[in-house]
């Protein structure tokens, strides 16, 4: 059997890699109202509108909790080690987007991450086409759930 520490680290690394690979697939992103210059990769940042920021953070929180709930419902960890692996996968899978959010505070040390994120992220934006983008993402989610099971 694999060393549990190594397995946890591998789970975390695979989750990060799967996030970047998934970003390469054209997908729908819900619009964030609190971002200034959303189409300009170099100059986009969080805006100063407090109510828009609260709304966006609320949307992201619901999105995150829903995703975690679905993962827990499918994987159903029982042992402590299973819980650790699932948490490592969740944190690793969410980390790239979290770091992108921090980057929009103009944190220069995150430039290498943003560069990597931009390389992997598809340039095909399905934001204006939710009737295509959302079903496409649902198909990808079903395939991912099938693999998990």
Residue ranges and their predicted role:
Residues 1-149:
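N-terminal membrane-targeting hydrophobic helices
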């Amino acid at each position: 059997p694999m060393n549990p520490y190594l397995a946890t680290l591998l789970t975390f690394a695979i989750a990060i890699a799967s996030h970047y690979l998934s970003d390469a697939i054209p997908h729908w992103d819900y619009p964030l109202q609190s971002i200034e210059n959303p189409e300009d990769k170099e100059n986009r940042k969080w805006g100063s509108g407090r109510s828009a920021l609260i709304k966006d953070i609320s949307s992201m929180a619901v999105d995150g909790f829903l995703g975690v709930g679905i993962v827990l419902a499918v994987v159903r960890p029982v042992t402590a080690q299973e819980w650790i692996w699932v948490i490592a996968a969740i944190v690793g899978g969410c980390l790239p987007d979290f770091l992108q959010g921090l980057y929009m505070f103009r944190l220069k040390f995150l430039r290498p991450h943003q560069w990597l994120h931009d390389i992997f992220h598809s340039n095909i934006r399905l934001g204006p086409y939710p009737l295509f983008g959302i079903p496409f993402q649902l198909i990808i989610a079903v395939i991912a759930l099938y693999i998990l099971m």
